[in-house]
Amino acid sequence: MAAERGAGQQQSQEMMEVDRRVESEESGDEEGKKHSSGIVADLSEQSLKDGEERGEEDPEEEHELPVDMETINLDRDAEDVDLNHYRIGKIEGFEVLKKVKTLCLRQNLIKCIENLEELQSLRELDLYDNQIKKIENLEALTELEILDISFNLLRNIEGVDKVTQLKKLFLVNNKISKIENLSNLHQLQMLELGSNRIRAIENIDTLTNLESLFLGKNKITKLQNLDALTNLTVLSMQSNRLTKIEGLQNLVNLQELYLSHNGIEVIEGLENNNKLTMLDIASNRIKKIENISHLTEPQEFWMNDNLLESWSDLDELKGARSLETVYLERNPLQKDPQYRRKVMLALPSVRQIDATFVRF
């Protein structure tokens, strides 16, 4: 297949970006969030389960036979090369691509990152869904800005410290247990480590340009070591083991905060986060809406699946003049026969209550 530029490739690029946005939400909550939030913040439960099943496959059980690279005709002048699901077993023969900027090798049978030294103009490398166990041999890719090695078999973050121009790093659904070896990535804007085995937020204080941090579906017990990330606008921590909202005082530019599926009991610690437009605290153990009356920018408020009983708590949201979406279902107050009517009366700006739009 000749790898060519054009309308077809542009469409492929757009599909890759949509895929990557979805994987960036690896925190796994209600599918409705994908429709109501400005950026996709969660992977649907079914997609997450499918991904887990893929990620846990034993590569030794793989019955597909690798393709012979000599049967693939590469366009030497191509800037964008998409070889998604080609049964490629080894990275080889790509040295002819002197002009390539984007190389997509998704859903192949690759076990090792190798033979990329000649691709010095490469800016995006996509190795999503392969059988890679180690990040290595990237030193020559000095122009690389986007790297995706999600859904592989990685256990450590390594081999990226020399790729100092990286802006986006995706390592979703691996077996990583520690955040490390990222201190040289001063240009990094997005870091996605969802669905791993991480227990602590650490070793990210030099990532001062970071704008989006996704750590959903890990084993993190505490919000900490975030003080240096003053440019952070999106923080996603769903499906961890958090019990308290804390450590966010320096995140004055934070706009979207996702804390669903944890063990949080009290809304607190948001005194300095005045730019929040999205607050997701669904599926926790919270009994009361409090300590957020100073937030005037929220457009979405997710507090479904908690322990909210009192209608007077909704007064805490009246300062949010742009509030359009609230999720309060599966709280005790939903048992009220006038549930939707009372929400509308308390929050007249709201246009969507749970999954249903308000009719006037």
Curated annotation (Swiss-Prot):
Region (Disordered): 1-64
Basic and acidic residues bias spans: 17-34
GO cellular component, one term: nucleus
Keyword Mitochondrion attached: no
LRR repeat feature ranges: 77-98, 99-120, 121-142, 143-164, 165-186, 187-208, 209-230, 231-252, 253-274, 275-296, 297-318
Main localization of the protein described in the UniProt heading: nucleus
Membrane-crossing segments per the record: none
Stated family: Belongs to the SDS22 family.
The protein's role, per its UniProt record: Regulatory subunit of protein phosphatase 1.
Known partners and oligomeric status: Interacts with PPP1CA, PPP1CB and PPP1CC/PPP1G.
Designated name of the protein: Protein phosphatase 1 regulatory subunit 7
Source lineage: Eukaryota, Metazoa, Chordata, Craniata, Vertebrata
